[in-house]
Amino acid sequence: MTSMSTAATIKLPYQQQQHHLINSNNSYIQQQQQSPQQHHQQSVNINNCNNNTNNNNNNNNNNNNNNNNNNNNNNNNNNNNNNNNINNNNNNNNKQIPQQSIQTHANSILQLNKTMPHVNPPQQNHIMNQQQQQQQQQHYQQQQHPHQQQHPHQQQHPHQQQHPHQQQHPHQQQIQQQQQQQQQQQQQQQQQQQQQQQQQQPQQQQPQTQSTQERKWDEIKIYSDLIKRFALEASHLTISKENYDDLYNMAFCLFKTVDSMDPDKMPMNMGGNSRKNSFDMYNNNNNNNNNNNINNNNNNNNNNNINNNNNNNNNNNNNNNIVYNPYGNDGPTIPSPHLQHQQQHQQQQHQQQHQQQHQQQQQHQQQQQQQQQQQQQQQQQQQQQQQQQQQQQQQQQQQPQYHNGMPHHMQQHSPESMDHQRIVKLPTGNQNNNYSNDYYSIQAVHSPHLGPSMHLQQQQQNQQNQQIQQQHQQIQHQQQYSQLPIEQQQQMMLQQQQQQQQQQQQQQQQQQQQQQLQQQQHHQQQQIQQQQQSIAKQQMPQQQNTPNNGSPSSSDGKSPVNSNTAITSNNNNNNNNNNNNNNNNNNNSTTPVADPQKNFSGEVFFDDIGQDKPQRRRRRTMYSSRRNLKCHYCEVTETPEWRRGPDGDHTLCNACGLHYAKSQKKLAREKELEKQKELEREKERENTRKHSIDFMLMNDTSSAPTNSQNPTPN
């Protein structure tokens, strides 16, 4: 019975009251059976007890209402302190409440309790009430008669007093002592369970958050590495659609995990505190939910009346960030060393992350400084080059050269004439501008982001600088010549003129040579074209004048000259070669041509009908299925080597194929003769038409004077 009662009271304190009522009723029935003479007196006592319990319940409800009001005030003060603590924690990039803020908050609440002694936490109030009840019970038991004891329902409130006429049986004393022992055990078990729950809740929260955050960071690292690999491979490979979809999905997963991360735990590179303000409400809500759960557990374990439960459920919206110690005056609970170790570990991780970020920023700044130094060095080198060029120009000015009234060095391009581009030498090679193994890169002076207006401004500035330099050079040039005597000036002028004449002569010679080369090339091209035209002209009349036998003959019917015979034979050979090449191209479109040395059968067949010479080819694989077919003419089963049409509908043997080819040649020649005859007939018809028209016109002109009224026929 004791174990069952303890289990019931741990879950629901209201069941404890029912259990006590049942025990009291059972004891009352036993008492009736043992002493029926005292029935009337005990019934009176029970009625009085019930009245007292009702009064005490009312008093308890009133006191609980007062306590709830006080708790509301205390909770409001706690909310203000909690909001300040949460803001401080967010600024420190920590989601959990640190130990210092808990201690400061606890001290502030203890000070409030000292100033207002009637205000106590709900758990402490309940414990103090129980202690007062036990003390008063002991005091009353000492004053009472040994046969008179209080009913078990009267132990709930200290203001309950015993009626002087109440008396109980001595057997009931033992039951009451057992019940008191059970209650004490239950209270101790409740306190132990509360301590365990309070220690387990923060321990469960931290590993879950740490594990989820570590998983997310691992996912982010994996996705970022994969995306980097894809990007590197994409620079020298073509991406298929599947790879592109994979890359898109990985990027989407990465951004999704980054969005779900806490910005306070993220490093600065990933946008650490950029979205901090948007997460303040989220952090406050999480803290409030955790505190509400703690308050619910405390209220459900500490209240013994239904009214108290209802009142405390109404107070769930009030937030208490401090977990109270069940022993009352010992102050707030001290977190376990495991939690302290985890907090220290997290703080160390944050410090390491901040140090890494600081180091990265320093490295970035150092790189920028190095780049700036390199740019300055390049600018200094360019300035040195310009100074060297100016010195060379000054040396040349000591031996001036005039061309058309202007000095020669004025014709040279200044180093600033390159408006848009400048040559920047890469680290390898020498500084000289010789065409060696040195590598140069042309860099644009103006950035692509500059508009056309900036581009024009740069051009104008360059032109102004050129004009200023020219003026300075002219002044220096005049000063040098003004210092020299007249004779030396004349000699210098003569030397310059001679040099200029020599240069002009050299240029003229070069131009003449180029013209000669162009003329030679032009003559060669003309000769080649003439030869081609002559060959084409010779081929045309020979094709027209060839008779049926194919022997060359002239239009007069005589044998041609020896010189012409050689030309005609060459032309015929060329025609045959052209036909063979055309046949090769047509055959390659159907089947690939192998080497002539391999799989050569030595058998003869024709591809086209009107060909002069047979062409030796390999046996085709397309005829392998027709080995047992009959010839279309002689109907003899032989290997078919001839075909009639391009589709290969009719197969022929070797003899019939030769006969078929000859017959086809005859047909082709007959068709050509018919065409020629038709052309001659058309010419004759045209001639006859012309004669008839002329004859008609002559008749019209002769009959014109007679028929003066109708000169034209109707």
UniProtKB/Swiss-Prot annotation:
Bias (Polar residues): 271-282, 550-569, 699-714
Xref: CDD domains: ZnF_GATA (cd00202)
UniProt KW keywords: Coiled coil, Metal-binding, Zinc, Zinc-finger
Record SMART domains: ZnF_GATA
Compositional bias segments (type: Basic and acidic residues): 667-693
Stretch list, region Disordered: 28-97, 115-180, 266-362, 394-419, 454-476, 528-621, 667-714
Compositionally skewed regions (Basic residues) per UniProt: 148-168
GO terms for biological process, alphabetical: regulation of transcription by RNA polymerase II
GO molecular function, one term: zinc ion binding
Gene3D superfamilies (UniProt xref): Erythroid Transcription Factor GATA-1, subunit A (3.30.50.10)
Stretches assigned to coiled coil: 661-694
Zinc finger intervals, GATA-type: 631-656
Stretches with biased composition (Low complexity): 30-94, 130-147, 169-180, 283-322, 340-362, 457-476, 528-549, 570-588
InterPro entries (alphabetical): Znf_GATA, Znf_NHR/GATA
First and last residue of the signal peptide: none
GO-annotated cellular components: nucleus
Pfam family for this entry, one: GATA
Name by which UniProt lists this protein: GATA zinc finger domain-containing protein 10
Record organism: Dictyostelium discoideum (Social amoeba)
Lineage: Eukaryota, Amoebozoa, Evosea, Eumycetozoa, Dictyostelia
